[in-house]
A protein has these predicted regions:
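Serine-hydrolase catalytic machinery in alpha/beta-hydrolase-like enzymes
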Residues: 12, 19-45, 52-61, 66-157, ...
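C-terminal catalytic histidine-bearing segment of alpha/beta-hydrolase fold enzymes
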Residues: 110, 233, 238-281
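Acidic catalytic loop of the alpha/beta-hydrolase fold
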Residues: 217-222
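Loop/turn elements at helix/coil->beta-strand transitions in domains of secreted/extracellular proteins
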Residues: 57-59, 88-91, 162-163, 187-190, ...
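Hydrophobic alpha-helical packing residues
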Residues: 84-89, 228, 232, 271
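Primarily recognizes the serine-hydrolase "nucleophile elbow" in alpha/beta-hydrolase
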Residues: 135-207
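Short beta-strand/loop motif that positions the catalytic acidic residue
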Residues: 212-214
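Alpha/beta-hydrolase
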Residues: 64, 194, 244-247
């Protein structure tokens, strides 16, 4: 992890959802795996990535990066995904949601991250969305504000308010799921948890269609069953699930040398097949 200067975010819109209790260290950026991350986020923002009006479908996706609620993978699981969606005519909005406070020093932060992933990777570790709701009030509030903002500016952004969904990666997948479970006013039209927890949930009535992705060699969530998929099926709600042989965890748009890059095109095809990409008239 190498500290870097904060990049310019001229299009970022403050969501005005408040700060983070107990946070004293400022927001800090660093580079890991060759891409930028941020941590100690105490002010939530939403950054629009709008498609060429000639290609716009009217669909929109709120994009929630992952990072264990200690950091956010802004490029690989945020901006890059948003650019790819916009290129397909889908308006994308990267949600920089509030995360837990971390030590100001990089060495102490790295130690905290290592401990978190070691705990999450235990075979007996269970990250149940139903149980996580109470501890994720900030990300849920940020996601709710994001949905409200997109719908309030739908005409300006050429978005159909009824076709606003959410995609999230790892912790962002958890944010997507707890928002679906605990924030009925968000009303995501569809959800896409990408390499998130596969634990079963109590599926809400009229739960949105779900597109889920996981790698069979994911060190955090593989080999722990597919309760989430089973729960959606049992509830009679639409679900599509892609399990890739290899990809590990945190592969973003896909890991080279594996079939995991196929998930993005499959997701867009799924949106189309479910009627979410009907072009705006």
């Amino acid at each position: 992890m190498t500290p870097i200067s904060a990049p310019a975010e001229p299009a970022a819109i403050p969501l005005r959802t408040g700060g983070v209790a107990g946070s004293s260290a400022p927001e800090a950026w660093f580079r890991q795996y060759g891409v930028p991350f941020t941590r100690n986020v105490s002010t939530a923002t939403l950054t629009p990535f709008l498609p060429d009006p000639a290609k716009a479908t009217g669909a929109a996706v709120i994009v929630a990066p992952g990072g264990g609620f200690l950091m956010l993978s802004m490029e690989a699981e945020g901006w890059a995904v948003a650019r790819a969606l916009a290129a397909r005519g889908i308006a994308a909005f990267v949600l920089k949601y509030r995360v837990k406070p971390t030590p100001a020093g990089m060495a102490d932060f790295e130690q905290a991250v290592s401990a978190m992933f070691a705990s999450a990777g235990r075979s007996d570790s269970r990250m149940r969305p139903d149980d996580a709701v109470a501890g994720l009030a900030n990300p849920i509030a940020d996601a709710r504000a994001a949905f409200a903002l997109v719908r309030s500016r739908a005409t300006e952004w050429k978005v159909d308010p009824a076709r606003v969904g959410m995609i999230g990666f790892s912790a962002g997948a958890m944010t997507t799921m707890v928002t679906t479970l605990a924030a009925p006013d968000a009303r995501p039209a569809f959800i896409a948890p990408i390499y998130g927890s596969m634990e079963a949930v109590k599926v809400p009535a009229n739960a949105p269609p779900m597109f889920a992705v996981l790698a069979a060699d994911d060190p955090l969530f593989a080999h722990k069953g597919f309760g989430l998929i089973d729960a959606w099926q049992t509830a009679g709600r639409p679900v599509e699930f892609h399990l890739y042989e290899k990809g590990g965890h945190g592969f973003g748009l896909g890991k080279k040398g594996t079939t995991s890059p196929g998930w993005f095109s499959a997701f867009v095809s799924w949106l189309d097949a479910n009627g979410f990409l009907k072009p705006t008239q």
